[in-house]
Design a protein with these regions (language model features):
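Flexible glycine/acidic-rich beta-alpha junction loops that bind and position SAM and/or redox cofactors
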Residues: 1, 45-47, 77-85, 106-109, ...
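Glycine-rich beta-alpha loop elements in corrinoid/cobalamin-binding modules
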Residues: 1-155
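Generic structural signal for well-ordered alpha-helices
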Residues: 20-28, 84, 174, 241, ...
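Conserved SAM/AdoMet-binding glycine-rich loop
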Residues: 34, 243-307
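Conserved, mostly hydrophobic/aromatic
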Residues: 69, 177, 212, 216, ...
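N-terminal [4Fe-4S]-dependent radical SAM core
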Residues: 129, 133-205
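N-terminal pre-triad scaffold of radical SAM enzymes
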Residues: 193-220, 253
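Conserved alpha-helical substructure of the radical SAM core
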Residues: 225-253
Length: 307
């Protein structure tokens, strides 16, 4: 690429490859004893051993290469508050091993806890089938109602532990999160550098849901947000849309309403709300489940209200 849409002015070369790892190592060099907690899409999708396209190699958990102390995967609203409360109470970051939606490293697993043991990292390097087996086990444990605690060995004295994911947010919680007073733009200091081009795609868009029960093999959304759909209320979305119209750069139209799975406005079936997603089959493959609720009326009603 000749430009970088996420950099001021679209200039290439300002952001390093493996940004989380680079920045964390620089922080660790300057602030040796400060807790480093990572999250976001890069950390989430590299939380355990993973294939890296840039280097064409299997890489270790980003938690090890970045030298971070704790990793929060998924959307993280609940887990980040729990971690902040624990640190505020004086707890050492290395003792924060009990929060759902987190990944941490240890020299030896706790014998009082149960784990689902993944193939060790060395076996992944030696046998591609072991890597497929490992990812399948990870994929089978993305549901907060049934997921087990995962243990990934790196030799005999280093282990990465993934706690089960956080429970989905309720609609009230979703409304609260998206109702916070966000600035909806980049930092003003970037303006003189040409602004950040990527903001144009999202500044006047509305997120209405998260999660996906589609399970497409080319997509990582389920691995990041889970299979259970979570939605905002119509009132929350309409309120944000109204505020958007007062933005000085608003052109009179909304770019997008929804997200990758915009037409999913409810869990695939009623069972998912109390028991989670099925472990023995997918919602849509090889044929749609008979219990799946296929109804777009709520989304259509939302779009009509926004119009």
């Amino acid at each position: 690429r000749q430009t970088d849409a996420f950099t001021p002015g679209g200039v290439m070369g300002k952001r390093p490859d493996y940004a989380v790892t680079v920045y964390c190592n620089l922080i660790r060099r300057s602030f040796r004893d400060v807790p480093i907690i990572i999250g976001g899409i890069e950390a989430s999708l590299r939380r355990l051993a993973h294939y890296d396209y840039w280097s064409d190699k299997l890489k270790r958990s980003i938690l090890l290469d970045s030298q971070a102390d704790l990793l929060l995967y998924g959307m993280g609203e609940r887990s980040i508050v729990e971690v902040a409360d624990a640190l505020n109470d004086g707890m050492d970051v290395h003792d924060i091993t009990y929060i759902d939606g987190t990944v941490f490293r240890v020299k030896a697993p706790d014998e009082n806890l149960s784990y689902l043991r993944l193939p060790d990292y060395q076996s992944l390097l030696e046998n591609p089938k072991k890597y497929a087996e490992s990812f399948y086990l990870q994929y089978q444990n993305t549901d907060p109602f049934s997921a087990k605690r995962l243990l990934e060995p790196y030799g005999v004295q280093e282990f990465v532990v993934q706690n089960p994911p956080q429970k989905p947010l309720s609609q009230q919680e979703m409304d609260h999160v998206y109702g916070l007073p966000y600035c909806r733009t980049y930092h003003p200091s970037y303006e003189k550098l040409g602004g950040v081009p990527a903001i144009s795609e999202v500044r006047f868009s509305l997120a209405s849901n998260r999660g996906c029960f589609g399970a497409c093999s080319f997509c990582a959304l389920t691995f990041h947000q889970g299979r259970i759909i979570q939605t905002r209320s119509h009132e929350s979305i309409l309120d944000e849309a109204e505020k958007m119209t007062h933005e000085p750069d608003f052109k009179g139209y909304i770019h997008d309403v929804g997200g990758p799975t915009a037409n999913f406005r409810q869990p695939a079936c009623k069972k998912q709300l109390t028991k989670g997603a099925c472990q023995n089959r997918q919602c849509l493959f090889p044929t749609p489940c008979k219990n799946m609720i296929a109804d777009h009326s709520d989304y259509v009603a939302l779009l009509r209200k926004l119009r």
